[in-house]
Structure formats: structure tokens, C-alpha cells
Amino acid sequence: MSASVRVWLIVALVALAAAGTAVGVTLATRTDVAKQTSKPPPYAADPTARPEIARAVQEALRAWPAGTVRRLRILAERYPQSGLVRLELGLALVLTGQQADATKAWLDAERVQPDSPSAVRAQDLRHPNTPPDLPPFVPSFSQPTSAVQARLLRGAAFQQELRPVSAEREFEAAAALAPANPEALTAAAVGLYDKDRPALAFSHLGPLVRRFPHAQTVRFHLGLLLIYFGDARRARRELALARSQGPRTPLGRRAYTLLKAGQKS
């Protein structure tokens, strides 16, 4: 991904309410990893971690540099289902020059606790040239008026909390309730996005363009996913089409924000 596309995405996500504060946390983590190894690895708080695990991890980080890796390895054995321990172990390993072991630790974080901020951040660290976090589903409404919309808002809230599995579950439930609803189907497709397998989300979202050619949500989210994928030219085209389908709607205004951010990058 080019530097200009990366800047575009970061600027744009700040303006998207669905992005929450997760972008800042992830960017800070990446920045600290690139700095001098005299500082301990950054602690990335994970609300899904049990309090005693969080405390033990922070104590291990305070032992930097002498005992941190050893303590985190012990914690990994003690807490085999903790993504936070494995995320921080990977950070400590990469700062001591053990890149291969760090990558394995991050893969383990994703495997043992996929529905956690630690798993999302671990995937980010394995893909340092991609945008932070996962593409958000942006609802076209703010207050739900149906069970389907309630599911969509819950899924978007889980995305803000960096809980991708829970978000995907809510989006799939919405699509099951309304199999002909373009917004529910779009959310389900967005929820499938994975940096190791981005084609899966596109394979579900692409056909919706043909099925719902006038659905603004489909065009908007296709453009958003294309930014994450790094295809700026096609992203601009889809976002422009989305805006043309309703420039004054919430999604139309967000499409304009993304397009303006692209001009500044």
C-alpha cells in the first residue's frame, strides 16, 4: 500500500464514527514497535482479558528488558487461551530481534482468542503495510426501527470494540432475518473481511452491486473495502458513485469525507 493511500485511510477513518478510537491505539502500538528497544513493549489494553492476566502482563513488561520475554512465555503456558499474553509476547520478541517467533506468537493470539482486540492488533502487526484494524460497517441510520437494524447496530458496536467474531455473528443474523435487505447483506459481507483472505469479503460484496445497483450502502462499503485493499483508483470510483446516489444522506456525506481525504493525501 502506498504512503498516500495509507494517509488517505487514516485521515478518513478519523471522520467515520464507526471507527471509534481503535485506530489510535493500533497506530500507537505500531509506532512504538518501530522505536528503540530500550523502551519496553507498549501495553495494549484489552477489555476482554481477565484482570489478573492484564496485571501479570503489565508486571512482565515492567521487567524489561531482562525478564520480560521469559515471564511472558510463562504466562502463555499458564493462560493458553489469552490473546493479550501472546500479543505482548510477540511485541517483546520483535523488539529483541526474534521476528519469526514474534509472528508465531501473533498467529497464536489470533487463533486462541479471535474475538478480541488483541487478535485484531496481532493481525495488524503481521500486516504492517495495511491500514489499522478492520473496515467498519457504517449504518445509514442512527436509531433502529426494526430487529434487523438493531442487529446491525450491535454488530457495528462490536466492531468499535474490536470484537470481529461477535460483529460477524450479528451481521449474519441480520442478513438471515432480511435476506433481501441490501444493508444487512452488505454488513454481512463487510464482517467477513480478513487481511489474510480479503477475497472472501469481496466475493460476497461484489455480486451485491449487480443485485442492488442503486443501493448506496453497497457502493459505499465497496469503496471502503477497496481503500483497505489498497486500490485507490477503484475506491474513488465507487465512493463517487455512492455519493451520486444521495449526496445529502449520512453515507453520501461520509463518501464525500473519504473523497476529500483522498485529495489531501
Model-derived features: positions:
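Alpha-helical segment of the N-proximal tetratricopeptide repeat
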Residues: 46-79, 88, 146-173
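Start-of-helix register in tetratricopeptide repeats
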Residues: 50, 54, 84, 117-121, ...
